[in-house]
Swiss-Prot record:
Domain of life of the organism encoding this protein: Eukaryota
Disulfide bonds: C43-C58, C51-C63, C57-C68, C62-C75
Signal peptide coordinates: 1-19
Entry protein name: Conotoxin Im11.8
Family stated for the protein in its record: Belongs to the conotoxin I1 superfamily.
Coiled coil: none
Record flagged with keyword Membrane: no
């Protein structure tokens, strides 16, 4: 049972840690993404989607003015 739970947890965390490195806080973003999953929050990849913070928007998008927008600079 413990082995199955460990395997499931690894499968959940692995996609959060893979991908292109765009900043030094990759590990922190992975942890925050995992917290969002446990809170049942999902990010939106739609431009103009309503958001309340930067974790509501996926990828290189930031939450500016309550909407997800594409940015080239890191979100603040």
């Amino acid at each position: 049972m413990k082995l199955a739970l460990t395997f499931l947890l690894i499968l959940m965390i692995l996609p959060l840690m893979t991908g292109e490195k765009t900043s030094d806080d990759l590990e922190l973003r992975g942890v925050e993404s995992l917290r969002a999953i446990f809170r049942d929050r999902r990010c939106s990849d739609n431009i103009g989607a309503t958001c309340s913070d930067r974790f509501d928007c996926c990828g290189s998008m930031c939450c500016i003015g309550g909407q997800c927008v594409v940015t080239f600079a890191e979100c603040s």
